[in-house]
Amino acid sequence: MDEQAGPGVFFSNNHPGAGGAKGLGPLAEAAAAGDGAAAAGAARAQYSLPGILHFLQHEWARFEVERAQWEVERAELQAQIAFLQGERKGQENLKKDLVRRIKMLEYALKQERAKYHKLKYGTELNQGDMKPPSYDSDEGNETEVQPQQNSQFMWKQGRQLLRQYLQEVGYTDTILDVKSKRVRALLGFSSDVTDREDDKNQDSVINGTEAEVKETAMIGKSELTDSASVLDNFKFLENAAADFSDEDEDEDIDGREKSVIDTSTIVRKKPLPDTSEDRDTKEALKEFDFLVASEEGDNESRSAGDGTDWEKEDQCLTPERWNVDQGVITRLKEQYKKERKGKKGVKRPNRSKLQDMLANLRDVDELPSLQPSVGSPSRPSSSRLPEQDISRADEVEALTFPPSSGKSFIMGADEALESELGLGELAGLTVANEADSLAYDIANNKDALRKTWNPKFTLRSHFDGIRALAFHPIEPVLITASEDHTLKMWNLQKTAPAKKSTSLDVEPIYTFRAHKGPVLCVVMSSNGEQCYSGGTDGLIQSWSTTNPNVDPYDSYDPSVLRGPLLGHTDAVWGLAYSAAHQRLLSCSADGTLRLWTTTEVAPALTVFNDNQELGIPASVDLVSSDPSHMVASFSKGYTSIFNMETQQRILTLESNVDSTASSSCQINRVISHPTLPISITAHEDRHIKFYDNNTGKLIHSMVAHLEAVTSLAVDPNGLYLMSGSHDCSIRLWNLESKTCIQEFTAHRKKFEESIHDVAFHPSKCYIASAGADALAKVFV
């Protein structure tokens, strides 16, 4: 009974659910004894040993499941840690790779600078100790690869150390001379004369003093004996010698050109005295026999045609080939050296000056000062550049050029490097062959095509067609006049990207409001502090231009509006500003031309065409060649020149006026050439005509567009003409050849009108157009 009750009591004391049966156990046993054996068997079955084992197994299984889940979570975290470590290692490898590339590019840039400096000036560029980039060995490599990389690092250190030794001893130039001599000797193309010259060169380089030669020989012998075993395994001496002579071998220059340039460089750096060959020289040269193997390797790496080039060069070196007095050549060399020393501080002419010179050269039949052909020093086309040609090239560099203000904005930006490195188009000038004149004309016209104007800014703030525009003379600022009764000022440096196009949008920084009708014309003063506008209300409003950096949301400034110039009774069609006299010209639909002072708001000083003999003026401009004259076009097809001082009409330009067709002879715009006495007119019949202001004769007439020509503008240098038309196109013309060099569509049509005005910036690389589609576009 006790043995059977023991497990039950133990179970009831330990099991949490048996607390209620702890005191009922004896009563149950008594009841079981009184009721029968069946009740006692049921009580014993509830606390049996299999039940305990089942409970333990259940708890153990639950513990194992939780442990498995913990291990899974730990494995996931370890995998995440490994992934992050791998990502970090990848970033470090990427950083190392980028650092290596940066070092490589820096080294390549230094080599490129040295190359261009050598080609341009003929001397080496001092950039300090220009060593190839050294990279640290990767830490993650296997142990088998580390000894090899360490040995390579030791090789590099050995090369650098030996290079320093050679520089200290002074063997740099010697190795160059001996190397070139060995190559010619191996190829079998050296003649007696060249051998003697080479021996003299080697004597002058090696035999500075007898003590130096002996000391050099002793140092060379000791180095060779100590490093014989190293030379058997490593051939870094070959690479070191190649680095001295072929630093730019990686570039697109063959060995022949490189050797010629190196030879000339050595000649310029060290004048070679006339010394004879002696025993010390031969002994010193014997120490460089180990370079024969390196020369054979270099010979294999050169192209197959180098042997012929060496032969040609050696033949060129012989004076018998040229029948030239050696004294004359020596004298020319000395003269060239003096000129080069005196011209080191002289800056090469820029692109605009070269263009001025080319424009002047086109009108000259012969150029006696340039009889020999001039080759560009930046792009050598032959294996040898004669000393005479080099001196002539320096004479061309010393020529004076006429001043130019801003012609560089016509040409492309990619010529900036070319203008700094060479003579540009002057490299192809030859006056010996007269048949080259046509090719020169074609090349000069081709240069004008290099600059392609592309749309840059789109000005979208006006609500109606834009009638006129004017650039600030200095700043990148534009003022537009529109039919929506307003003028707007734009700062082209304050841009914002457009939503659906590659061009940039510019918001106006100021809006001028005073006109009671459409604004038809606008002009700025020479200093950019005032602007004047005319409209259909017959008023000429005078404005003070605001600061280009003004906040568009600043409070209203009443001082901007200076006041109206009263006098016209109908629409003002055109304005022109005279910087020389500070006067303003205006033409109006009332048939008069008026001259105003700009220093104050006052009535007109002079009135022209009171009787309307020539018709109603449509356009007016100042004659640039004579500031006291003005030119105006009229509705009847006449163009006349007036003297503003005497108030008299002095000349009426030639015109074929047909009274029956008044619309076809209408002149929409007249402008004056900025440097020549020429007037240019734009006609309703699609023509552009050129007139001589002195004689009034028609110089040239051409059909320029498919529809009426509405606007004209000439660049500040007077080389290019820009025209706008109602056919939606803007065309750029070469004024010398009267040919179109570029055409682009700028605006859309509205009420059969398209482009109202075009303009060049006086000092910056901008052109602008105003259209009937309420847009103004700026091109660069």
Curated annotation (Swiss-Prot):
InterPro entries: G-protein_beta_WD-40_rep, Striatin_N, WD40/YVTN_repeat-like_dom_sf, WD40_repeat_CS, WD40_repeat_dom_sf, WD40_rpt, WD_repeat_striatin. Residues 149-166 are annotated as: Calmodulin-binding. Residues 299-315 have a biased composition (Basic and acidic residues). Residues 55-63 are annotated as: Caveolin-binding. Residues 124-145, 290-321, 334-353, 363-388 are annotated as: Disordered. Residues 338-351 have a biased composition (Basic residues). It is found in: Cytoplasm; Membrane; Cell projection, Dendritic spine. The modification Phosphoserine is found at residues 137, 227, 229, 245, 259. Part of the core of STRIPAK complexes composed of PP2A catalytic and scaffolding subunits, the striatins (PP2A regulatory subunits), the striatin-associated proteins MOB4, STRIP1 and STRIP2, PDCD10 and members of the STE20 kinases, such as STK24 and STK26. Interacts with CTTNBP2; this interaction may regulate dendritic spine distribution of STRN. Activation of glutamate receptors weakens the interaction with CTTNBP2. This is Striatin. It comes from Rattus norvegicus. The gene is Strn.
